[in-house]
Regions:
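A composition-biased, non-transmembrane "mature-region" signal
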Residues: 28-29, 40-47, 64-66, 87, ...
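Phosphoinositide-binding peripheral membrane targeting modules
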Residues: 44-49, 54-79
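Residue-level detector of beta-strand structural context in well-folded domains
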Residues: 23-25, 48, 77, 86-89
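Acidic, Ser/Thr- and proline-rich intrinsically disordered linker/docking segments
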Residues: 83-116
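Beta-strand-connecting loop/turn residues
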Residues: 32, 55, 82-86
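Short hydrophobic/aromatic-rich beta-strand segments that constitute the beta-sheet cores
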Residues: 36, 57-61, 88
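Anionic N-terminal interaction surfaces
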Residues: 4-48
């Protein structure tokens, strides 16, 4: 039982550690968007971006297994931060739109804009 649990946990950790990561972010005061740039795992190569306004999420990711794009009203999304992973999930279907590695410091900055 213990070895099975250890195997499952190591699989979860290894797959989550290969996620793309938040490389930098900025707030565009002119247009009211938080712009988050995402880079590939173990690289500085940009592979997507996430934009959050006061009522909408726009994302475009082409980062290995984290692929997708969309525009979704914030009222239909639940943001989550757990174990250095920032994700957005549909409140209706439960579908996870994206998951990216993110430090606590980065998330504290992002959180200011998603909790407005």
């Amino acid at each position: 039982m213990k070895s099975t649990l250890s195997s499952i946990l190591s699989l979860i950790v290894s797959s989550s550690s290969k996620l793309p990561y938040v490389s930098h972010y900025s707030y565009d005061f002119q247009h009211g968007w938080l712009n988050i740039v995402v880079s590939e795992y173990k690289s500085q190569k940009t592979c997507g971006d996430i934009r959050i306004s006061n009522n909408e999420l726009q994302y475009k990711l082409f980062c290995g297994k984290e692929n997708g794009k969309g525009m979704i009203p914030l009222s239909k999304i639940k943001f989550k931060y757990e174990k250095d992973i920032f994700s957005a999930q549909s409140i209706i279907s439960g579908k996870i739109f994206f998951s990216v590695k993110c430090t606590q410091e980065q998330y504290r900055y992002i959180e200011k804009y998603i909790k407005k």
